[in-house]
Amino acid sequence: FNPCPYSDDTVKMIVLTRENKKYDFYTLDTIKNHNEFKDTITLKPHVFITHGFTSSATAENFVVMAKALLDKGNYLVILTDWRMAACTNEIAGLKLAYYPYAASNTRLVGNYIATVTKMLVQKYNVPMANIRLIGHSLGAHISGFAGKKVQELGLGKYPEIIGLDPAGPSFKSNDCSQRICETDANYVQIIHTSNRLGTERTLGTVDFYMNNGYNQPGCGLPIIGETCSHTRAVKYFTECIKHECCLIGVPKSKNPQPVSKCTRNECVCVGLNAKTYPKTGSFYVPVESKAPYCNNKGKII
């Protein structure tokens, strides 16, 4: 018995470009009908965005993130909608009990994204270097599983996977093969915002601990504000798409240096350009309680 069964038919994709911002659902079979795929080549950088438990591709946070990407650059954004396998349509009071079922579907959804990637590379000549994955919560692990699968398929690695507060329950004590991991892409960027729904464990090439990785400012009391802290990862990253070098991470230590002393050589900016900075490892990121959450007073490093 799985109340939230997975099949390839239950996963849909919303494909957005600057020219076509319609929220239509596509499948592996119908994606060829999208204007962007009428030709056999597409040169745009591609970004997959994948939601988490009991969410969907049309949830406001992901709609806002997709818009920020299209405002920023000439991207092709694919919002992966796996809501049925994520237990989104289940009875509210029972949803939490269904979490293990949604968690067990993550590898299958990751394999699906890898299959779409294979089609993009082989049928539409999209270079792997042009495909980046962003996932929130369970969607972060899905992105990691996609990263493992494309390597198995002989496609090489994605240039980057961005894990927004990867889900802790069912995953935090797993080894690399059973969760998002730094070997899943050439660069794996992790943003930690909740130590209960997420995990404090380092998982990536860079791990950003926003406000120490828990109890995000503006989210209210600990525990009660846990969902707010968990989803804040999506909002932080969206602001970092809009405002370059908005949130600066300082190397994690007992006495982190102030952001004002940062230089490009030892600190790293959260966001799409993080991988252009030389430093890797764990970083502490102070944040404000309201958007755009910036900690840099306009400083760009």
Curated annotation (Swiss-Prot):
Protein keywords: Allergen, Cytolysis, Disulfide bond, Hemolysis, Hydrolase, Lipid degradation, Lipid metabolism, Secreted
Disulfide bridge map: C4-C87, C176-C181, C219-C228, C245-C269, C246-C294, C262-C267
Any one Gene Ontology cellular component term annotated for this protein: extracellular space
GO MF entries: phospholipase A1 activity
PROSITE patterns the record matches: LIPASE_SER (PS00120)
Catalytic activities: a 1,2-diacyl-sn-glycero-3-phosphocholine + H2O = a 2-acyl-sn-glycero-3-phosphocholine + a fatty acid + H(+)
Its EC number(s): 3.1.1.32
Subcellular location(s) of the protein: Secreted
Active site as annotated: S137 (nucleophile), D165 (charge relay system), H230 (charge relay system)
InterPro entries given in the database record: AB_hydrolase_fold (IPR029058), Allerg_PlipaseA1 (IPR002334), Lipase (IPR013818), Lipase_N (IPR033906), TAG_lipase (IPR000734)
Keyword flag Ribosomal protein: no
Name of the top EC class for this enzyme: hydrolase
Biological processes annotated in GO: killing of cells of another organism; lipid catabolic process
Record field: transmembrane: none
Tissue expression per record: Expressed by the venom gland.
Protein family: Belongs to the AB hydrolase superfamily. Lipase family.
Function of the molecule: Catalyzes the hydrolysis of phosphatidylcholine with phospholipase A1 activity. May act as an allergen and induce hemolytic activity.
Protein's recorded name: Phospholipase A1
Organism per entry: Vespa crabro (European hornet)
Lineage: Eukaryota, Metazoa, Ecdysozoa, Arthropoda, Hexapoda
